[in-house]
């Protein structure tokens, strides 16, 4: 699910989770998902990142809906937590304090926790925020495996459009309404993607992720070229002092 801030992405997720009632329209969720069928990974706040509990305790808390009114976790629930820690590669961190972990490790812990609640559907809200590039690639590798090998369905809100298009089966683009819904490979050719990738200012396209443009400095040769986005930009080559090397921006 992609879209600008305030477009309704998180609101839709909260509707799926039953945390908000729709003010209009109709939202239908399969019966088996209404109780223990959905695992949720919300955006982390600073307070959550500093949570003073062990990794095992955080993962086990995903079994709360299974535990009901019982004061203690059952052996089955502890086994589920252990299995999910092993699946996510965090067994060795079980007794470590959650707040001492890196951002990527914390995300693994929270996904293991979410898997304790369900094996059907994970809803992830901006899960890569604050992660470094290597941790982001590790994260996508992890959820790719969950989806393709363990058959866990994943709905993810993201601003990371490049990876979203590469990894997702389908893209839903919201802007208070549905601008696009369909296969990811069709999305990049849609008008919705064009608006998302570009801002218009006085009729001139301001390039973002899909376009590349150089700042004008002395000694530049300007050539108008058509970018992959379909817009025409002035691309520049900068001559490097002391040689004939040109740097394309």
Regions found by a protein language model. Give the residues of each.
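Conserved ABC transporter NBD signature motif
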Residues: 25-38
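Conserved ABC ATPase "signature" region
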Residues: 75-93
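Conserved ABC ATPase signature
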Residues: 97-101, 105
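Catalytic Walker B motif of ABC-type/P-loop ATPase nucleotide-binding domains
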Residues: 122-125
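H-loop/switch region of ABC-family ATPase nucleotide-binding domains
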Residues: 158-159
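H-loop (His-switch) and adjacent beta-strand-loop-beta switch element
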Residues: 170-183
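ABC ATPase nucleotide-binding domains
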Residues: 185, 189-249
């Amino acid at each position: 699910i992609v879209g600008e801030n305030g477009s309704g992405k998180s609101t839709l997720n909260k509707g799926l989770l039953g945390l908000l009632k729709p003010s209009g329209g109709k939202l239908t969720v399969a019966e088996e998902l209404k109780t223990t069928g959905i695992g949720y990974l919300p955006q982390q706040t600073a307070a959550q990142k500093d949570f003073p509990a062990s990794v095992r305790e955080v993962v086990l808390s995903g079994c709360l809906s299974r535990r009901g009114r019982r004061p203690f976790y059952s052996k089955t629930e502890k086994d589920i937590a252990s299995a999910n820690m092993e699946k996510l590669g965090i067994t060795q961190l079980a007794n470590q304090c959650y707040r001492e972990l890196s951002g990527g490790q914390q995300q693994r812990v929270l996904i293991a926790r979410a898997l304790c609640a369900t094996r059907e559907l994970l809803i992830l809200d901006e899960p890569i925020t604050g992660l470094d590039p290597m941790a982001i690639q590790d994260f996508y590798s992890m959820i790719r495996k969950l989806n393709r090998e363990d058959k866990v369905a994943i709905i993810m809100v993201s601003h990371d459009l490049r990876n979203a298009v590469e990894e997702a089966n389908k893209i839903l683009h919201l802007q208070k309404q549905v601008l696009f819904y369909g296969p990811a490979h069709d999305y990049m050719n849609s008008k919705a993607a064009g608006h998302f990738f570009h801002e218009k200012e006085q009729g001139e396209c301001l390039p973002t992720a899909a376009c590349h443009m150089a700042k004008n400095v002395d000694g530049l040769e300007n050539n108008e070229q058509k970018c992959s986005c379909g817009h025409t930009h002035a691309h520049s080559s900068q001559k490097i002092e002391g040689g004939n090397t040109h740097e394309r921006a």
